[in-house]
UniProtKB/Swiss-Prot annotation:
Phenylalanine amide modified-residue sites: 9
Annotated GO biological process: neuropeptide signaling pathway
Main location: secreted
Protein name as catalogued: FMRFamide-8
Tissues expressing this chain: Detected in the thoracic perisympathetic organs in larvae, and the dorsal ganglionic sheath in adults (at protein level).
Length: 9
């Protein structure tokens, strides 16, 4: 789920 964390931006 760490990959989608930067997608939050």
């Amino acid at each position: 789920a760490a990959g989608q964390d930067f997608m939050r931006f």
